[in-house]
From Swiss-Prot:
Pfam family name, one: Lectin_legB
Record's function text: Lactose- or galactose-binding anti-H(O) lectin.
PROSITE patterns in the cross-refs: LECTIN_LEGUME_ALPHA (PS00308), LECTIN_LEGUME_BETA (PS00307)
Cited CDD domains: lectin_legume_LecRK_Arcelin_ConA (cd06899)
Protein name: Anti-H(O) lectin 2
Subunit structure: Homodimer.
Keywords: Calcium, Glycoprotein, Lectin, Manganese, Metal-binding
Organism, as annotated: Cytisophyllum sessilifolium
Single GO molecular function: metal ion binding
Length: 243
């Protein structure tokens, strides 16, 4: 079967089920840290962590496309002053298994400097953008959840109130893809409120048959350095016939 399912209640610093690029690593506390902060690091700091085994998201032979569900918890650790806000965000992504770590900072490790659509990326991501700054001309100008398809400019964004989120408040994320309707839905829940949105994405048109799945995180040095930390992760995908 090309179906896949896994669950991490926490992460093992010595485990073999994740691969890393850039500044991503598992801490001794069992937390998956997507990027570091500190002195002696580049201005833009990023990292990727992905599940070690690629899986089939669609089949050219049968026409099947996978539906999936994933859930995880994350929090933002800001320094030196949480009142300054956070930067730049994290993503949950599907991409080619050998895709590189690209530009960090506001590009979140998935894309290069151009915000033009580029089908060679073969990447679909849900981004949790904590900045949305006007300086990032591709962003809507406010912090947001966005869906990215082969470009850093989201095809749809939903405003998120990240203020008051910088003191290790835990976010609960639930993301689903329904193959029959090509509907990608992302839900972000904090103790006080919930944000969710859905958008149509054609996986066959935008992803290779086999993909890897994981997370990226990125921050920019300059007073709002943030580590993006994943506490746990569940993922399950099933190939099914298109209706």
């Amino acid at each position: 079967s090309n179906d896949i399912s896994f669950k991490f209640d926490k992460f093992d610093p010595n485990g073999k089920q994740l691969t890393f690029q850039g500044y991503a690593s598992v801490l001794d506390t069992g937390v998956l840290q997507l990027n570091k902060v500190g002195t002696g690091l580049p201005k833009e700091i990023g990292g990727i962590a992905r599940y070690v085994a690629p899986f089939q998201i669609w089949s050219k032979a049968t026409g099947e496309v996978a539906s999936f569900v994933t859930s995880f918890q994350f929090f933002l650790e800001t320094s030196p002053n949480p009142a300054n806000g956070a930067s730049d965000g994290l993503t949950f992504f599907l991409a080619p298994p050998n895709s590189p770590l690209r530009r960090a900072g506001g590009y979140l490790g998935l894309f290069e400097t151009s915000n033009k659509s580029d089908s060679s990326y073969q990447t679909v991501a849900v981004e949790f953008d904590t900045v949305g700054a006007p300086a990032n001309t591709w962003d809507p100008g406010y912090p947001h959840i966005g869906v990215d398809v082969n470009r850093v400019t989201s095809i749809k964004t939903t405003k998120e109130k990240w203020n008051k989120r910088y003191k290790r408040e835990v976010a609960n994320v639930w993301i689903t893809y329904q193959a029959s309707s090509k509907t990608l839905t992302a839900s972000l829940t904090y103790p006080q409120d919930q944000t969710s949105d859905s958008v149509s994405v054609d996986f066959k048109a935008n992803l290779p048959e086999w993909v890897s799945v994981g997370f990226t995180g990125g921050t920019t040095v300059g007073g709002r350095e943030t580590t993006h930390e994943i506490l746990n992760w569940y993922f399950s995908s099933t190939l099914e016939y298109q209706t």
